[in-house]
């Protein structure tokens, strides 16, 4: 399969730079996987699309202020983007500088360059950095870090982004990007879903900066997926198995929830799904056999991204590309702060030929 098969024209004006005033007031494009039928509505219509006993699976990761500015002690300006917190003192990070720092280099971080750190080792494209400070990494980031808005939101981060770029149920700090499908859920909508009898469970996948890396190969099968840490605890496994047993659907909120659940299913030895606490490099593209997820809530993704490939594997390539074409024509808002889709699984997607 060619990466260009997943390209589409997107006017710049449809990229959302700010969220809607109310989280659940965005538009919702519903795609019926088996037929390809499209329905236009608003996000709160989700209430009518879910049945009592259906299971919503959310990702409860919390975005950390992962972008740091400063300079090398030798003088050159640097920008640090945290990929992962290794422990209380160390991070793994991308560093942008005119000349990459060498192991042992001293870094002065923060807008006032008040935080001292040392680049201790290099691991491929990533740098290991140790803070010379009494505070924990998380405390330091909360003090001097900026919210790492995606590159396509072409503006500096603002104080409001510290809450707007978080889900209302975010709990475990560690992500460099928000699981954006979850941004549309507010407390009133969650309360109505609970009142209807919709079940809820929470996985954790700490979204890494790799999620914004373009696919740099021509053929999809040659792409090496970035690694991210995911947790699917026992209570989620039990909720999934119970939903399946009673004939209800498992509905993933966001592609990160999909990747967590399907990673746990891939690793399972004795059951459909088993607890999972590990890094995952799962790459879902057409031909992938879904085992757990029956429906998906997701935002609109970038052309030629691994995420539009994941959606194509779920709903079918042609149905997905037709839906995106309709979304552009109807002027839906795209990407992290944009509108959403509700998609049901197309069991025939696995047999579809792409790009022929």
From Swiss-Prot:
Keyword field: Cytoplasm, Queuosine biosynthesis, S-adenosyl-L-methionine, Transferase
Enzymatic reactions: 7-aminomethyl-7-carbaguanosine(34) in tRNA + S-adenosyl-L-methionine = epoxyqueuosine(34) in tRNA + adenine + L-methionine + 2 H(+)
One Gene Ontology term from the biological process aspect of the record: tRNA wobble guanine modification
Signal peptide: none
Superkingdom of this protein's organism: Bacteria
Pathways involved: tRNA modification; tRNA-queuosine biosynthesis
Main location: cytoplasm
GO CC annotation terms, alphabetical: cytoplasm
Coiled coil: none
Family: Belongs to the QueA family.
Name assigned to this protein: S-adenosylmethionine:tRNA ribosyltransferase-isomerase
Natural source organism: Escherichia coli O1:K1 / APEC
